[in-house]
Amino acid sequence: MNYEVYCGNAHAEPNSSAVQQLAEACVEQDASYFDGCSRTCVKDKYLLPLTQFDNLEIVVYGQIFPILVLFAVFANAAVALVLSKKHMITPTNVVLKYMAIAELLVGLVPLPWTLFFFSMGNIKETHRLELWWCYLQKYSMDAFPPVFHMIAMWLTVLLAAQRYVSISHPLHSRSACNVKNVRLATMIITVTSFLCGLPKSFDYEYETVHGWIYSHGNWTYASSCVMMPTAILTNMGQTVYFNIYFWTRALGFIILPSFLLVLLNGLLIKGIRRAQRRKLRLLREKRSEEAARQRDSNSTSLMLVAIVSIFLIVNLPQAIFMGLLCVCETFTIKIPILEGTFPAVFLIASNMIVIATYPINFGIYCFMSSSFRQTFKLLFCPGASQLQCERRIEAASAVHSSRRRSDICSHLVNVCTNSEGFMQVSHHCLHVDYLVSDRQSTQFTTMDRSD
């Protein structure tokens, strides 16, 4: 089968009256377009423009998007690396790590197409269009990014639910929300998301056309991708096929998780306030160790509330938009705002905002988690971290005997964690009476701990 057709002079519009009559008769039959090359009326194929707003997309996808992705890749890769260290493995951190990987792929997968087509200027070279351009655009911009976004969406729900169980039912959380179960839930979310995203990969096949096309009353010299329905789409019917796909995506992966996130976020905030009152009561009762543990738990919960809230702020508008779009398409309701240029511009802006929030999560981790900061320094600034460790050991040698030995030890253990996942502690930390003796280093690992 010939997938690429070249014919006609791009600077000479067909002017034969016979061809014009054929073209007009074709359009009157509700055909897709009239092919001036083969002089055939095309009914089951559709032209697919690679862009809708050239100038806007050149700026957004060609200039802004690569910079945003660069920051997002660094931030999410750093988060995934830090949370992969053995001493950082907790149920909460496991979810955060997989969220970072999913969010990284949301930005990284479209990058080859945006660099090739927009940044490298091939948007102005469509006369060189080849078949692989069509498939690259489809899979990198349309098929796979929504799948990874679905995964990130449900992982955020898992994160909020896991944390709510941890603070509301701490005894049950150790068995129900352990690392093994969290990884199993992540696998189920990933597989389900890919299965629900598969229909988008099997809706159309492609060919290319280079020649004169008559459509909407005008002749156009087109170098364009042409979509052809697959056998699955033809047998099911386009209305049924796309209604199932978009309603599943809208309800199961946008509206429902958004509703659950609003609910769980509210419950988390309520739980944090209750835990704060408990901490104050423990302090009044002079149970300082329990109060310190409660403070750490509250800090983790506050960090997760911040992450979930940011995720909701940028994704709720998309949820509302997708819900309206599905209702209008299913019941053929006309809403002026959903016609014209608004939907495309809204989605472009919304996608950029989503990518721009990913580095913010990294900032939240650094600001609110001391263990994250320390592990990050050990991974990416090992020299500075070792110097800091040595200085604190020196400081410990000057501590008076009135200070508790456990205070010194816990202080050093918190800082001197090396990049291999080991905690590095001087013997002086373990035996405060011999702080002035020659230092020898001991290494030990922490056990996996639940929240």
From Swiss-Prot:
Cytoplasmic side: 85-97, 162-183, 273-301, 356-451
Name the UniProt record assigns to this protein: Sex peptide receptor-related protein 2
Its job: G-protein coupled receptor for the neuropeptide like protein nlp-38. Plays a role in several types of aversive gustatory associative learning including gustatory plasticity and salt avoidance learning. Its role in salt avoidance learning may be through activation of the transcription factor crh-1/CREB and de novo transcription and translation, which in turn promotes the formation of long-term memory.
Cellular compartments annotated: Cell membrane
Family: Belongs to the G-protein coupled receptor 1 family.
Tissue: Expressed in head neurons including the ASE sensory neurons and the ASI and AWB chemosensory neurons, the midbody neurons SDQ, and motor neurons in the tail.
Organism name: Caenorhabditis elegans
Glycosylation sites (chain numbering): 15, 218
GO biological process: chemotaxis; G protein-coupled receptor signaling pathway
Segments on the Extracellular side according to the record's topology features: 1-63, 119-140, 205-251, 323-334
PROSITE patterns the UniProt entry points to: G_PROTEIN_RECEP_F1_2 (PS50262)
